[in-house]
């Protein structure tokens, strides 16, 4: 799906397959109980609706464990919109962090901010950062004149270790925000000097960035840089370790163990020259590398191009056909033809998302696509535990251009 009003020519970004560390030996506050209630129930699902930015603000839909769905959760609780053109969210230590570009005021309604922090159980707003709040010191080597530089939209992805270590990205690079002081710094080595922050491909891509303990992992690559896996550390504004990878672009990252990642890389859109690489994060070594003759591109979407459930890796490469790869036999098969269940669908709004705990697959589609068009759409929920997919739920017009879907259980890993 070519979402030109969102991305322009930028190809960086990520669905979030990350868990928040439970380490309490920091000033990030006391973590809540392992499992929470309300909207933080691990059996629930959060839908982040980007919305048609010229006609509506972003919103939250919540799919409850009993299968019922609640629309516009944040507005119901707070009486306002969290932001315009929602991009990503994360949950950590009982807080929800919602990120938006927040450039437009549809129907003359301003969103609360670019980054909104809310209570995870209630969605009650607690803290807001506007674009004016989020400026960072000019990096060494930059040709910009001003000492403090603004973020560039689109914003991309967010991963939170604690309130002192909020990592997020835009097309310039990766940033670390201390949510208690508002201090924002760009991570050294991630700034795109190639074209002063307006590169065709960002050096560090945060699509699929993953937190394990005190470390954050994301990959990078593109036209001007070698493809690598990067490690960042709590409290640090520098890259800790780098590991070279095969492939040109980043599709996504899946966490496959306590200290193991599966990194998916690919060629240009439409290319079937892809790679899957297993990495041991303790030894910082590649344990398995397999070429894959399939298009696993994440396209222009802000979520991971691959998603894992059981022994299968699922992907759609921006199409309305969901394929899966067996990690046992390494065979690829077409698994779901979306138009069989949503005949009017024409566009994927985000990459497919799996819930590995319940063996469910979420596919979000729309009938139209436009920054001012509020389109009909479907969120299809499939049981993928068997050889054939089983449609469990078809949610019609319960979201608006969902930019990502978050089974809440992923935040408790």
Identify the meaning behind each predicted range.
Residues 1-45, 236:
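Bacterial Sec-dependent N-terminal signal peptides
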Residues 32-35, 81-91, 135-161, 195-210, ...:
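Repeated scaffold domains used in trafficking and secretory/extracellular systems
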Residues 50-156, 161-163:
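Post-signal peptide N-terminal segment of secreted/secretory-pathway proteins
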Residues 54-61, 106-116, 173-178, 224-231, ...:
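Structural motif
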Residues 64-67, 119-123, 178-182, 232-237, ...:
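Short loop/turn segments that connect beta-strands within beta-propeller blades
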Residues 69-81, 124-149, 183-200, 237-244, ...:
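A short beta-strand motif characteristic of beta-propeller blades
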Residues 180-320:
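Acidic, serine/threonine- and glycine-rich low-complexity intrinsically disordered segments
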Residues 374-413:
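Blade-level signature of beta-propeller repeat domains, shared across WD40, Kelch, NHL, RCC1
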